[in-house]
Amino acid sequence: MNNMKTFKFLTALFATAILTACTLDMERPTNVQYIDKTDAIWQQHLQKIQKIQSYQAKGQIGYISPTERFSSRFEWQYQNPKSYTLKLYSLISKSTLLIQMHQSGMTISDNNDNQQSAANAKLLLQEIIGMDVPLEHLAYWLKGQPAMNADYQVGTNHLLGAFTYHVDGSQWTADYLTYHSNNSMPENILLKNDSTKQTLKIRVDEWIY
């Protein structure tokens, strides 16, 4: 890639007013009631989502940090920790950004044939997009599966309600605001990291698994 500045185009081409779905309250919900983790219906659902090894999700995403603010449509395809893709579509242009994880690391490319690869996926995401989001964990967070060592809560709907998880010395929280009624998969998710002041609002419109 010849010009890193022309490639880092999210601010110019993706930046816009955060989509309506993501301008809903960015603060964590309060006065939420939870039930015991041993709930039989929750345990049955947990076993179901643990068996979903590969899947696709489509929807919209809004991201806010001290240095970046953008919203886009997204397509997420996950096979395993070394094979997944995240495609972002600008809401105000035809621009696209493709993030691909593979055996040798990560590649980020756009629809103008700009491309950058690196073995360190975390640093590449920060350099190109300005995001410090652990995509390897997002694969589980997106489908509402808490990590084994996560501090999580089960909602009165017998589904994952919220969790707290430490990654690279900082703390992420997630609140599962709504679920799809037809498959009990997450619909609206609020992810926050108060240490890095990042907020990620995700709306999943379609699940394929």
Curated annotation (Swiss-Prot):
Membrane topology of this protein? Lipid-anchor
**HAMAP family, per the entry:** LolB (MF_00233)
Subunit relationships: Monomer.
Q: Which GO terms describe its cellular component?
A: cell outer membrane
Q: Indicate where a lipid (S-diacylglycerol cysteine) is covalently linked.
A: 22
Protein name, entry field? Outer-membrane lipoprotein LolB
> Keywords assigned by UniProt?
Cell outer membrane, Chaperone, Lipoprotein, Membrane, Palmitate, Protein transport, Signal, Transport
- Indicate yes or no for the key word Signal: yes
Q: Which residue numbers carry lipidation of type N-palmitoyl cysteine? A: 22
- Pfam families, per database record: LolB
Q: What does this protein do?
A: Plays a critical role in the incorporation of lipoproteins in the outer membrane after they are released by the LolA protein.
- Look up and give the organism this protein is from: Haemophilus influenzae (strain 86-028NP)
- What is the superkingdom listed in this entry's lineage? Bacteria
Spell out the PROSITE patterns in the cross-references. PROKAR_LIPOPROTEIN
Q: Which SUPFAM superfamilies match?
A: Prokaryotic lipoproteins and lipoprotein localization factors
Q: Provide the leader sequence positions.
A: 1-21
InterPro entries reported in the protein's UniProt record: LolA/LolB/LppX, OM_lipoprot_LolB
Q: Which family does it belong to?
A: Belongs to the LolB family.
